[in-house]
């Protein structure tokens, strides 16, 4: 795997609070190697490990993007939803930021069928295809289209399973992680002090509740994806 300098700065991580963990009573003992100390009944993460795993994750997505791999970013809680969407759009990734639908990946045949319906209804609406229906029928179709937009808007251009999935909140995205593990899709995930680092392929010890830490880590990953994509398109 390519090893590059991604300009990961410990002072920058401290400034946005990447090191702040949860209350000590909520911890997962599997996170012990990544905890620096306790402070006022809260755990403080060791940012040396954060920098190490973030660098590894950047190298991994860079190599993937360089080979034309497809990425998905998952962040459905309110602290992560906007960041997930903005990052995905910046790097042309798929994203889920509303709700993870059970079976989205493991039942890909059904997801694919819904995506096709979404595509057809969108085309019909944009070309005046709803005009031939009664008001009631058109209203039903519009509601169906809005529901598909809410559920699948971030993956509307997906034609196959993603190659790499970036997850911003392990505790809230267990279903997504389980589906990725079932299918053998590599995962990169922020892991706070209450998480299980063994559930994902590349855990990044970090505060997963603050918008600042989430944005900082995502920005590094997106930078790496875009750098890899540039090389891919130059081939």
From Swiss-Prot:
InterPro entries: Ribosomal_uS2, Ribosomal_uS2_bac/mit/plastid, Ribosomal_uS2_CS, Ribosomal_uS2_flav_dom_sf. Keywords: Chloroplast, Plastid, Ribonucleoprotein, Ribosomal protein. It holds the Pfam family Ribosomal_S2. GO terms for biological process: translation. It is found in: Plastid, Chloroplast. One of its GO terms (cellular component) is chloroplast. One of its GO terms (molecular function) is structural constituent of ribosome. CDD domains: RPS2 (cd01425). PANTHER family: 30S RIBOSOMAL PROTEIN S2 PROKARYOTIC AND ORGANELLAR, SMALL RIBOSOMAL SUBUNIT PROTEIN US2M. Belongs to the universal ribosomal protein uS2 family. This is Small ribosomal subunit protein uS2c.
């Amino acid at each position: 795997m390519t090893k590059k300098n991604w300009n990961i700065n410990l002072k920058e991580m401290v400034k946005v609070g990447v090191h702040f963990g949860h209350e000590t009573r909520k911890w997962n003992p599997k996170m012990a190697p990544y905890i620096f100390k306790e402070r006022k009944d809260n755990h403080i993460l060791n940012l040396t490990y954060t920098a190490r795993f973030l660098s590894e994750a950047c190298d991994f997505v860079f190599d993937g993007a360089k080979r034309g791999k497809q990425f998905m970013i998952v962040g459905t809680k309110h602290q992560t939803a906007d960041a997930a969407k903005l990052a995905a759009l910046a790097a042309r990734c798929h994203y889920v930021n509303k709700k993870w639908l059970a079976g989205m990946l493991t039942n890909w045949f059904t997801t694919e069928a819904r995506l096709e319906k979404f595509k057809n209804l969108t085309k019909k609406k944009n070309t005046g295809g709803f005009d031939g229906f009664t008001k009631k029928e058109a209203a039903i179709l519009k509601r169906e289209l809005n529901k598909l937009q809410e559920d699948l808007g971030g993956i509307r251009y997906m034609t196959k399973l993603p190659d790499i999935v970036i997850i911003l909140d392990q505790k809230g995205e267990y279903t997504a992680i389980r589906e990725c593990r079932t299918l053998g899709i590599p995962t990169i995930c922020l892991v706070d002090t209450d998480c299980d680092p063994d559930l994902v392929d590349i855990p990044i010890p970090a505060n997963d509740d603050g918008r600042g830490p989430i944005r900082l880590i995502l920005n590094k990953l997106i930078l790496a994806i875009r750098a890899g994509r540039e090389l891919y398109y130059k081939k």
